[in-house]
C-alpha cells in the first residue's frame, strides 16, 4: 500500500513539474521575438502592441520567430477602426503572401472567431450569427485560440465561437502571426499575449 501511495505521489509530482505553463510572448516594451512582414505599422505604446494601416494600405503581418504546433493562446484586443485583422497559426510567409490558417478578428457581422484558410479553401467555418453579440466592438475583448492536432477551437470573451476538426490543419506547421488586412483604415490594440504549449 505504501509503495502504491509513493508511486502515486511521485506521478503527481512529475506531472506538476513538467506541466507547461502559459508564458508571455509579448514583453510590453518592444517587438523582441517577433518579425515585421510588409510595410504596415507595428509599434508598442504604453505596454500595448499596436497594428495600424500605413500609407501603402497593404497586407502586413507580425510573426513569431518561434514556430508553434499545439498550443493554447490567449490575448486581449481592442478595435479602434473599421477593418479586418486576425491571428494566423501554423503559417509560413513569403514577403506578405501568407499560407496557413487565420482565426478571424473583424468588425461586427464579419465572423470574428471563424477560421479562414489563406491561399486555399477560404472559409472553413464561421460562428453562428447569434454569437456575434459576444464581440464588444471598440472595447477590450479576450480571445482564446486552442490548436491541438487536427482540432481548432476559438472563444471570444469566454464564449466558444467554433470547434473544427480538419485533416489538413492537423498536418500544418509554422508560426503565429497577427494580421493587418489590405485596404487601409485598420487600427487594433493587443496586449497580454500568452501561450501555453501543449
Pin down the residues of each PLM region.
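Carbohydrate-interacting regions of secretory-pathway proteins
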Residues: 20-198
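Bacterial Sec-dependent N-terminal signal peptides
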Residues: 1-21
Amino acid at each position: 500500500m505504501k509503495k502504491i501511495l509513493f508511486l502515486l505521489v511521485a506521478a503527481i509530482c512529475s506531472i506538476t513539474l513538467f506541466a507547461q505553463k502559459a508564458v508571455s510572448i509579448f514583453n510590453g516594451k518592444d517587438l523582441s521575438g517577433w518579425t515585421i512582414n510588409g510595410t504596415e505599422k507595428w509599434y508598442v505604446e504604453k505596454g500595448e502592441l499596436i497594428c495600424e494601416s500605413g500609407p501603402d494600405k497593404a497586407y502586413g503581418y507580425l510573426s513569431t520567430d518561434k514556430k508553434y504546433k499545439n498550443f493554447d493562446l490567449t490575448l486581449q484586443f481592442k478595435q479602434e477602426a473599421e477593418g479586418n485583422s486576425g491571428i494566423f497559426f501554423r503559417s509560413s510567409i513569403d514577403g506578405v503572401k501568407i499560407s496557413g490558417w487565420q482565426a478571424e478578428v473583424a468588425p461586427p457581422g464579419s465572423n470574428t472567431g471563424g477560421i479562414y484558410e489563406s491561399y486555399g479553401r477560404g472559409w472553413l467555418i464561421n460562428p453562428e450569427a447569434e454569437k456575434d453579440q459576444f464581440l464588444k466592438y471598440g472595447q477590450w475583448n479576450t480571445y482564446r485560440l486552442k490548436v491541438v492536432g487536427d482540432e481548432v477551437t476559438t472563444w471570444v470573451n469566454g464564449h466558444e465561437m467554433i470547434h473544427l476538426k480538419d485533416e489538413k490543419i492537423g498536418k500544418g506547421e509554422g508560426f503565429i502571426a497577427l494580421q493587418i488586412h489590405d485596404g487601409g483604415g485598420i487600427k487594433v490594440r493587443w496586449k497580454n499575449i500568452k501561450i501555453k504549449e501543449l
